[in-house]
Amino acid sequence: FLPIIASVAAKLIPSIVCRITKKC
């Protein structure tokens, strides 16, 4: 359960930061 959330968060967080800061 937790490993799945961690892996999803690891993919989502960088993309969110990428969109907000526009640094990819």
UniProtKB/Swiss-Prot annotation:
InterPro entries: Antimicrobial_frog_1. Keywords: Amphibian defense peptide, Antibiotic, Antimicrobial, Cytolysis, Disulfide bond, Fungicide, Hemolysis, Secreted. One of its GO terms (biological process) is defense response to fungus. Expressed by the skin glands. Transmembrane segments: none annotated. It holds the Pfam family Antimicrobial_1. Disulfide bonds join 18-24. Coiled coil: none annotated. Its main location: secreted. One of its GO terms (cellular component) is extracellular region. It is found in: Secreted. Antimicrobial peptide with activity against Gram-negative and Gram-positive bacteria and fungi. Also shows hemolytic activity. Belongs to the frog skin active peptide (FSAP) family. Brevinin subfamily. This is Brevinin-1SPc.
